[in-house]
Every structure is written in C-alpha cells, then in structure tokens.
C-alpha cells in the first residue's frame, strides 16, 4: 500500500494506478480499492480520469463503495464540462439517501430498501436514458423508491469534460468543497453507454469471485481506464465483500 501526495506526481501516479489495478485483477483473487481520506482545504483527495467521456444518451454507472461517516454530502462521481459543472453527479446525503444529477436537471433523490451502513461495502448502479428521461438507482441489487421519468429528456451528456472521483466539481477540475467530498472507499467503478437490465445489475451486486465477473464498462473500465491520484489517495488490494 502506498500513499501518493499532490498533483506534481500526477503522471507517475496514473501509471502506477493502472499497473496496480491490472496486476491485481490478473491474480484472480483480489481487486483494488481506492481510499479517500478526509478533505481539508487545500487538500482534496481525488482521482481524475485521463481523457474525457464521449457524447452519451444512455448510461449505466456502477461501483462498490464504503463510507466512514455520513456527514455533509458524500460525492462519489462528478463529470463537469465548461457549460455545466453538474453534467453527471452522484452523491449520498446525511440520511443515507442517494442523489443523481444528469445534465444539470433537477436532482433525482431516492430512498432505498437497503440502508447504508458505515464501514460496510455496498453496490450501487445509476441508469439514465435520454429517450424518456428515465433515471433509476439500485443499491445492493434492489431498486430504490423515487426512480423517475422526465429527467433531462432528449438531452445528451456532452464530451470534452472531466471525470473526478471523490469530490464535487463546481468548475472543471476545481472549486472543491470539503463538505462535498467522499470520506471512504471506492472500487470496481464501471460506466456503460447503455442501460443495463435488472438481471445484469443484480448480477453485478453479487459478491462474485473476480474471475467470474464478465460485465465490464465499455466507457470506463476499472482495470483499464487510467486515473491520476491527488492529495493523499491510498490504493490497496481488497476483497470487496470481505
């Protein structure tokens, strides 16, 4: 386990992260997790994706997460463009409810049957389709109450922005707020340009052995996509469901 500090080592960290994730999955027994320590200005632990996303009219975003506390708003995934800082945003509030923002439209807030437990791994999937504006959230394989239609109907998530994990961007790559950050861990984050069905989402939420996981994102793939680590992010091997 190694902690990387500061943007000056960003390029090297990207290579280390990619190599670490790849070798961990090839072992067939472990996957990798990323730990985000507490934020305190001017230190905002985060992962920043190398490159950008394409234009998207459908998405499924899934990941495993574990939180150390429920205070403020815990931002997991932020995609910001020059025109919209909340082009795509996922977060957890103090009540343990998930919020999902697509293309700057009103946030979808849901209550899930599975409560979020501090210190325990949970799996979440967010889906959205431009055609009817259907947006859903499922936690641990179960759909939440409050899923809706009419969210950003006919819109396209624009290419050219920046993906940040663990912080909320109020401008592209910046204007972070310590009360809008993740204190916890992420793993197995994948993004698709289509809406996965319920059976696929249920399968992803199971504690399957890494060698038995066959559904990986075609836009972001946890063991392939490169990220740069900043401000004390910790990378380590992990058995997700241990």
From Swiss-Prot:
PROSITE patterns, alphabetized: PTX_1, PTX_2
One Gene Ontology CC term in the entry: extracellular region
Disulfide-linked positions: 62-125, 112-144, 207-241
GO MF, any single term: metal ion binding
SMART domains with a match to the protein in the record: PTX
Cofactor dependence: Ca(2+)
PANTHER family noted in UniProt: LAMININ G DOMAIN-CONTAINING PROTEIN, PENTRAXIN
Family according to the record: Belongs to the pentraxin family.
Stated role: Might serve the role of immunoglobulins.
Name of the protein this chain belongs to: C-reactive protein 3.3
Source species of the chain: Limulus polyphemus (Atlantic horseshoe crab)
């Amino acid at each position: 386990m190694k902690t990387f500090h500061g943007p000056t080592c960003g390029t090297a960290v990207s290579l280390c992260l990619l190599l670490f994730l790849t070798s961990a999955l090839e072992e067939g027994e472990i996957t990798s997790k990323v730990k985000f320590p507490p934020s305190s200005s001017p230190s905002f632990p985060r992962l920043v994706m190398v490159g950008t996303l394409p234009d998207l009219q459908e998405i499924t975003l899934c990941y495993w997460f574990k939180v150390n506390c429920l205070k403020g708003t815990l931002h997991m995934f932020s995609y910001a463009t020059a025109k919209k800082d909340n082009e795509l945003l996922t977060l957890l509030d103090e009540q343990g409810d998930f919020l999902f923002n697509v293309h700057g439209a009103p946030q979808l807030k849901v209550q899930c049957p599975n409560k979020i437990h501090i210190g325990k791994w949970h799996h979440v999937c967010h889906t959205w389709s431009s055609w009817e504006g259907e947006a859903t959230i499922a936690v641990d394989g179960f759909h939440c109450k409050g899923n809706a239609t009419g969210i950003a109907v006919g819109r396209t998530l624009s290419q050219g922005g920046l993906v940040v994990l663990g912080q909320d961007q109020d401008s592209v790559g910046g204007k972070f707020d310590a009360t809008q950050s993740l204190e916890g861990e992420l793993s197995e984050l994948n993004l698709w340009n289509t809406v996965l069905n319920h059976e696929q989402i249920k399968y992803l939420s199971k504690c399957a052995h890494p060698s038995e996981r066959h559904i990986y994102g075609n836009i972001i793939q946890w063991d392939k996509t490169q990220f740069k680590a900043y401000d004390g992010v910790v990378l380590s091997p992990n058995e997700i469901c241990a």
